[in-house]
Swiss-Prot record:
Name by which UniProt lists this protein: 3-oxo-tetronate 4-phosphate decarboxylase
Catalysed reaction equations from the record: 3-dehydro-4-O-phospho-D-erythronate + H(+) = dihydroxyacetone phosphate + CO2; 3-dehydro-4-O-phospho-L-erythronate + H(+) = dihydroxyacetone phosphate + CO2
UniProt xrefs under InterPro entries: Aldolase_class_II_sugar_metab, Aldolase_II/adducin_N, Aldolase_II/adducin_N_sf, OtnC
Annotated gene: otnC
Keyword entries, A-Z: Carbohydrate metabolism, Lyase, Metal-binding, Zinc
Native organism: Escherichia coli O6:H1 (strain CFT073 / ATCC 700928 / UPEC)
Secretion signal, residue range per the UniProt entry: none
Length: 212
């Protein structure tokens, strides 16, 4: 086995492990959600369409080109289009996680969210891990406009909320993207736990210090 093949096999196993962890801990249910990562040769490895994140076969993961051409494995999800849009427009993005996790999806269904940043910072971690979390308007799953909107937002952001749909998070590795997704989900959970109680938000100076 060549060095490249060994790296690819390791990444396949990592994707399967992380996806299974999401499923086992209740971040994903049924066949909802998809993950992807960039391979060293520029191709993309992604979870197949209709697949359960808790029961993936490393050898059947979808491989597609940077242009979206299906190369091998099972058929890729139609949502791979917006994964590709993120990779093309943010060179720091090496992996993408999209889930229908309970708390973030619930947050995406609320009216009156700030489309520029749905989470006003009240803990340091959302600032340190994700920065702003813009809202993408609702479109039917698979609609090309999701990819178009994410492409416009990708350069300056690494976490997004698809209205009435769920979260999308990038990372410089799949593990980092997974960590960022968990931070977003836990922050969304805190928003609902706090409810209408007065929140002590971080000040502009505190946010600037975290970003420096």
């Amino acid at each position: 086995m060549s060095d490249f093949a060994k790296v690819e096999q390791s990444l396949r196993e990592e994707m399967t492990r992380i996806a299974s962890s999401f499923f086992q801990r209740g971040y994903a249910t049924g066949s909802a959600g998809n993950l992807s990562l960039l391979l060293p040769d520029g191709n993309l490895l992604a979870t197949p369409t209709g697949s359960c994140l808790g029961n993936l076969d490393p050898q059947r993961l979808s491989k597609v080109t940077a242009d979206g051409e299906w190369l091998s494995g099972d058929k890729p999800s139609k949502e791979v289009l917006f994964h590709l849009a993120l990779y093309r427009n943010n060179p720091r993005c090496k992996a993408v996680v999209h889930l229908h996790s309970t708390w973030s999806t619930a947050l995406s269904c609320l009216e009156g969210l700030d489309s520029n940043n749905v989470i006003r910072p009240f803990t340091p971690y959302v600032v340190m891990r994700m920065g702003n979390v813009p809202l993408v308007p609702y479109y039917r799953p698979g609609d090309k406009r999701i990819a178009q909107d994410l492409a416009e937002l990708a350069a300056d952001n690494q976490a997004f909320l698809l209205a009435n749909h769920g979260p999308v998070v990038c990372g410089e590795s799949l593990q980092e993207a997974a960590n960022n997704m968990e931070e977003l989900e836990e922050t969304a959970k805190l928003i609902f736990i706090l409810g209408d109680r007065p929140i002590r938000y971080l000040t502009a100076g505190e946010i600037a210090e975290l970003r420096s």
